[in-house]
């Protein structure tokens, strides 16, 4: 059967989908999560072959796409940075045309948004963005599913992102929230405010949904009546040379218990897309502590382990939401309208 809404489409950025479509995917994710919990098979991709292209390393994205594909009856094949020649020895166009003849769908996690767009343009199969420097759409479905699970709704809630307001997670939270009717506040130093084009895009969606967008470096203004506090690493992959600068700049934007209390909402939840640098129990954490004198970075260990934390639910939801995207765009489902 033909899926007239999603069949054959790529999932490259949230802005390409309507509010109704994103809400449908979140609802489908919840349904597939329930089937998984009840051990009911859902092999909507039986016999399909899925290519997993990774320029950037990953734990959650790789694990989520792999388990989601297997649960759906598909066969995932991992191709790491040393296995693919995108833009190096072979153009992205040529690679896409080859992979599109061998695989039924392609996931890409890397640096360039243009690269994932070229894969979609030339492969002839659905392509799913597992993360680029600009957008992180599969993460957003997991994030907003987690929010919906905790509050029973999305519209009218307030989500506050604390930290680097220019990174892919901040971009995606801002735009996706605006589409879904969620008020999104970016709490960030002016030097790291989101790009003007991203803010304008979000404001356009917010006008349609009734949400509001706030970009501020004032903590009181940012977190007042917050339902969700969200943060991410201070230094994104590829920016390691800016570590000292970011630690100094972002220390006032750390999610700690003082910030939680400032929100004035005992029912708020804390989210983090992980990995989180909340202690010195890793080689990386010890190295940062020795070099920069900080034992906790974007979130304190107290908040990370508190009653407010939902990041491990959020991480699990990566699998369920990725499964929904693959099933809807490639599976034998009939969804004539949303």
UniProtKB/Swiss-Prot annotation:
One of its GO terms (cellular component) is cytoplasm. Reversibly catalyzes the transfer of the carbamoyl group from carbamoyl phosphate (CP) to the N(epsilon) atom of ornithine (ORN) to produce L-citrulline. It is found in: Cytoplasm. Pathway: Amino-acid degradation; L-arginine degradation via ADI pathway; carbamoyl phosphate from L-arginine: step 2/2. This is Ornithine carbamoyltransferase, catabolic. Its main location: cytoplasm. It catalyses: carbamoyl phosphate + L-ornithine = L-citrulline + phosphate + H(+). GO terms for biological process: arginine biosynthetic process via ornithine; arginine catabolic process to ornithine; citrulline biosynthetic process. L-ornithine binds at residues 168, 232, 236-237.
């Amino acid at each position: 059967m033909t899926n007239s809404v999603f069949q054959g489409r790529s999932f490259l950025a949230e802005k390409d989908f309507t509010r109704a479509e994103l809400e449908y995917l979140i609802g489908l994710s919840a349904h597939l999560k329930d089937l998984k919990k009840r051990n009911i098979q859902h092999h909507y991709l039986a016999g399909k072959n899925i290519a997993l292209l990774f320029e950037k390393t990953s734990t959650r994205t790789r694990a989520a796409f792999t388990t989601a594909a297997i649960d759906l009856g598909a066969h995932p094949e991992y191709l790491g940075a040393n296995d693919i020649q995108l833009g190096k020895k072979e153009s992205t166009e040529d690679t896409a045309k080859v992979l599109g003849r061998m695989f039924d769908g392609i996931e890409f996690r890397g640096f360039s948004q243009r690269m994932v767009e070229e894969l979609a343009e030339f492969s002839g199969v659905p392509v799913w963005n597992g993360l680029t420097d600009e957008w992180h759409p599969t993460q957003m479905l997991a994030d907003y599913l987690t929010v919906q699970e905790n509050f029973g709704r999305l519209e009218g809630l307030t989500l506050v992102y604390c930290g680097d307001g220019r990174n892919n997670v901040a971009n995606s939270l801002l735009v996706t929230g605006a589409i879904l009717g969620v008020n999104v506040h970016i709490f960030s130093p002016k030097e790291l405010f989101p790009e003007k084009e991203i803010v304008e895009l979000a404001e356009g969606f917010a006008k349609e949904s009734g949400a509001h967008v706030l970009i501020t470096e004032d903590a009181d203004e940012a977190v007042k009546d917050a339902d969700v506090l969200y943060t991410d690493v201070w230094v994104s992959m590829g920016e390691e040379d800016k570590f000292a600068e970011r630690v100094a700049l972002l220390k006032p934007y750390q999610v700690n218990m003082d910030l939680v209390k400032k929100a004035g909402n005992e029912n708020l939840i804390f989210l983090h897309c992980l990995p989180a640098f909340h202690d010195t129990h890793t080689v990386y954490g010890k190295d940062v502590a020795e070099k920069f004198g900080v034992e906790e970075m974007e979130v304190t260990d107290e908040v990370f382990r508190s009653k407010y934390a939902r990041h491990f639910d959020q991480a699990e939801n990566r699998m369920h939401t990725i499964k929904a995207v693959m099933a809807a765009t490639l599976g034998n489902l009939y969804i004539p309208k949303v």
